[in-house]
Amino acid sequence: MSDTDFDTALVASAFRVAAEQGWHKVNAVKAARAAELSVAEARARFPAIASILLKFGRMADQAALHHVPSEGTVRDRLFDLLMQRFDFLQAHRAGVLALLRALPGDPLTAMLLTCSTRRSMRWMLQAAGVDATGPRGDVQTHGLLAVWLWAVRAWERDKSDDLSSTMAAVDSGLQRAESIASWLDGSRPAPPAAKA
């Protein structure tokens, strides 16, 4: 078994364990045993639960970036990339939902995920053709992170087969982010001042 296959199998097993027992019951040993993988290899490759989470995030990014759209507007490309990332999450839905339920009581994991997801959003921006570097890139990255987190809330409640509610949330979030960015750039007039 290649390293990639091992990692994929262990991470998938970890999220199955989360779905069955809750996120706080997940560890690399339990995931390895459930998938009949080497515990020694699991220790070498996943020394902490954070390693599993970070690997899962990279796998989600790779799934999104595997088919980078080359046509359409930046907004169109970002929509496709984010939805491809949601397709990956959907394949592990029960485990991801277990993780999300655990976050309010686990601020360190929540912080880790926020930082990791912010890096992921920078990748999505750059893949869509946005120069997300420097202070402006930081603002754009935080903006896309806000869109993603907004859409995750919709995805949590979305029971449709085609993720229609999630798609609507991504689309409306990107539209709002685009409007704010245009206003900040001065390419759109500021909203009219309220009359006294």
Regions found by a protein language model. Give the residues of each.
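Amphipathic alpha-helical interaction segments
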Residues: 9, 80, 98, 139-150, ...
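Short, Lys/Arg-enriched anionic-surface-contact patches
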Residues: 1-10
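Helix-turn-helix
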Residues: 9, 13, 17-55
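Amphipathic, well-ordered alpha-helical segments in soluble domains
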Residues: 52, 56-60, 88-95, 116-123, ...
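Amphipathic alpha-helical packing segments from all-alpha helical-bundle domains
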Residues: 107-130, 138-150, 168
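Solvent-exposed, amphipathic alpha-helical segments
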Residues: 9, 13-21, 63-67, 99, ...
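Hydrophobic alpha-helical connector segments
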Residues: 55, 66-101, 105, 115
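C-terminal peripheral helix-coil segments that are non-catalytic and often amphipathic
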Residues: 126, 157-196
